[in-house]
């Protein structure tokens, strides 16, 4: 099995986007559909999707948009500074705002208490807070959010990597989402591979990164 660290994966992504001119929004869409492909939509009909404001969050919003288009019940929780949102995040957020008003930005412990009650009503949580680029201890609202996700003990799917896990070493950056399923995009991430607790829960899905990009970097 091919395994890469976070820096190598970033170089592959950048080569595909900058050199081969694969639109990043296309990769986001393929990532979203890869996650949905692995959900039993007859059993799982209501979702809380928790997103950061970067590209992992963009994947989460694209998942939300597709599920909303299918008529599923979706709540979206945004964790992070929206002034730092990626362009792909913004595009998907603008679309989601036209499909639902259940978009929340928890800012306080009181907001989290409301969120905790809301999470009890959904069948599935999708974790798209942090991707492989996390290199700092998780604190503040993000730490509370991850702790809350774990405390609900709801079936949880992580996009690419469990939020809070180091993409290279598998170490914990404080709180880590205890995922039931991980959909890893294109290539297994070393941090997941090194953590046996997560490795066996991981499915690798092709999201359309050309093999030429992979060969150019590896």
UniProtKB/Swiss-Prot annotation:
Gene3D superfamilies membership: YjeF N-terminal domain
UniProt xrefs under PROSITE patterns: YJEF_N (PS51385)
Binding positions for (6S)-NADPHX per the UniProt entry: 55-59, 131-137, 160
Reaction(s) catalysed (UniProt annotation): (6R)-NADHX = (6S)-NADHX; (6R)-NADPHX = (6S)-NADPHX
GO molecular function list: metal ion binding; NAD(P)HX epimerase activity; nucleotide binding
InterPro entries: YjeF_N_dom, YjeF_N_dom_sf, YJEFN_prot_NAXE-like
Details of cofactor binding: Binds 1 potassium ion per subunit.
First-level EC class: isomerase
Cofactor(s) annotated in UniProt: K(+)
Function summary: Catalyzes the epimerization of the S- and R-forms of NAD(P)HX, a damaged form of NAD(P)H that is a result of enzymatic or heat-dependent hydration. This is a prerequisite for the S-specific NAD(P)H-hydrate dehydratase to allow the repair of both epimers of NAD(P)HX.
PANTHER family referenced in this protein's UniProt entry, alphabetically: NAD(P)H-HYDRATE EPIMERASE
NCBIfam families attached to this UniProt entry: yjeF_nterm
Protein name as annotated: NAD(P)H-hydrate epimerase
Gene name of the record: nnrE
């Amino acid at each position: 099995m091919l395994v890469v660290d976070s820096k190598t994966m970033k170089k592959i992504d950048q080569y595909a986007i900058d050199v081969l001119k694969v639109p990043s929004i296309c990769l986001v869409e393929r990532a979203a559909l890869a996650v949905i492909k692995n959900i039993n939509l007859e059993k799982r009909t209501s979702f809380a999707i928790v997103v950061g404001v970067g590209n992992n969050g963009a994947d989460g919003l694209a998942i939300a948009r597709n599920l909303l288009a299918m008529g599923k019940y979706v709540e979206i929780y945004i964790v992070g500074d929206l002034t730092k949102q990626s362009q792909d995040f913004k595009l998907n957020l603008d679309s989601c705002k036209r499909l639902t008003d259940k978009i929340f930005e928890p800012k306080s412990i009181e907001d989290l208490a409301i969120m905790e009650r809301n999470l009890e009503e959904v069948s599935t949580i999708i974790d798209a807070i942090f991707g492989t680029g996390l290199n700092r201890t998780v604190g503040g609202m993000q730490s509370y959010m991850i702790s809350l996700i774990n405390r609900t003990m709801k079936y949880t799917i992580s996009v690419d990597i469990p939020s809070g896990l180091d993409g290279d070493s598998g170490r914990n950056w404080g709180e880590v989402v205890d995922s039931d399923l991980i959909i890893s995009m294109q290539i297994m991430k070393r941090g997941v591979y090194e953590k046996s607790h997560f490795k066996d829960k991981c499915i690798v899905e092709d999201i359309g990164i050309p093999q030429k990009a992979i060969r150019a970097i590896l």
